[in-house]
Amino acid sequence: MLRSKLSSLREYLTPINHNSNYETSGEISPEEFVQAGDYLVYKFPTWQWGSAPKKLQKDFLPPDKQFLITKHVPSYQRAQSYLGNTEDLAEDEEELDDGWVKSHRLTHEDPKRDIATDKKVPDIEDLDDFIDEDAEDADGEEFQDLGNSNLRRYDLYITYSTSYRVPKMYLVGFNDNGIPLLPHQMFEDISGDYRDKTATIENLPVSFNTTSVSIHPCKHSSVMKVLMKHAKTSREKAREFEPEAFVTGENLEPATETTQDTGIRVDQYLVVFLKFIASVTPGIGYDYTMDAL
């Protein structure tokens, strides 16, 4: 738990930066984290805001918006069962300098994965060109508890990291009988490519005496910058064909200057964040469908 204590100390000592530099660095401020969280909760009702005990609350966040949580998320298979051979992964993934992989292709579909149908909003033009949709299963699959002894359930928490200025996820798992999983069992649901890079055993920072496994991309902002670069390129190509009306969907105002510059709005940040976390936890079926962009 030494790494957990060091991480907590770093979070405590890092000063809060309220300046917005999302467009240049890919990082977000606490205010932008709240904005992105509101968007996530609106598009995916399975996610909700939570309030931490008073002693654990961060004063730079609203008392009732300390973290995001989705509960009882099913996991039917361990991460290892989603991995193909090394050659297949090498063709489908591009590793960034910080150890993150830009996309993740599953070798087979999970027929029991429960992805809720979300409210429709306009897509970012050509976003699918640079985000691998094979990591998502078809929407609307009916959830069925088949009595599988491999079934696990997870409570997932998203907090704001002051040291990295990005979201940070924590996993708390339970077996099919509701008994908490041990850390080494939760590690079985994390892709081997990331198990030693981004996963850490930590005390859940929004609760007392709860052991969790945290997943925090130390340079997640670098990943966001890559996405913004591709999105901007896609928008520029789209403008060549629709120079006067670069608007998607019905009853929408023209794209804002920020959206035109980055391609991804800051309030959509957590949807993209969850897409990448899905590469780390391929068997955990939380809501992250890219239709929300």
From Swiss-Prot:
One of its GO terms (biological process) is autophagosome assembly. Pfam families: Autophagy_act_C (PF03987). GO terms for cellular component: cytosol; phagophore assembly site. Coiled coil: none annotated. Residues 222-268 are annotated as: Handle region. It is found in: Cytoplasm. PANTHER family: UBIQUITIN-LIKE-CONJUGATING ENZYME ATG3 (PTHR12866:SF2). Monomer. Interacts with ATG8 through an intermediate thioester bond through the C-terminal Gly of ATG8. Also interacts with the 40 amino acid C-terminal region of the E1-like ATG7 enzyme. Also interacts with the ATG12-ATG5 conjugate. E2 conjugating enzyme required for the cytoplasm to vacuole transport (Cvt) and autophagy. Required for selective autophagic degradation of the nucleus (nucleophagy) as well as for mitophagy which contributes to regulate mitochondrial quantity and quality by eliminating the mitochondria to a basal level to fulfill cellular energy requirements and preventing excess ROS production. Responsible for the E2-like covalent binding of phosphatidylethanolamine to the C-terminal Gly of ATG8. The N-terminal region is involved in phosphatidylethanolamine-binding and is required for ATG8-PE conjugation. Belongs to the ATG3 family. This is Autophagy-related protein 3. The lineage of its organism: Eukaryota, Fungi, Dikarya, Ascomycota, Saccharomycotina.
